[in-house]
From Swiss-Prot:
InterPro entries: SlyX. HAMAP family: SlyX. NCBIfam families: PRK04325.1. Belongs to the SlyX family. It comes from the Bacteria. This is Protein SlyX homolog.
Length: 74
């Protein structure tokens, strides 16, 4: 195999690696975007829950406890 053919083979291998890496990066980017949306939703839910807890007892000096809540079936 002469030097030109060896260089062509190496270039083809590098192009294949580059294409595979681009695919992996695109997949990871999509996953990060999905996780970001999930995190944003969870943060909004947490803020809403915190606000509801504050609205129930804004003057409370003690932290909120689930033990103070009586389930509806009792």
């Amino acid at each position: 195999m002469d030097a030109v053919q060896e260089l062509e083979r190496r270039i083809v291998e590098l192009e294949i690696q580059s294409a595979l890496q681009e695919d992996v990066i695109a997949g990871l980017n999509a996953m990060v975007a999905e996780l970001r949306q999930t995190l944003d939703l969870q943060q909004a839910q947490l803020r809403l829950l915190y606000q509801k807890m504050q609205d129930r007892n804004p003057d409370a000096q003690e932290p909120y406890s689930l033990r103070d809540e009586i389930p509806p079936h009792y």
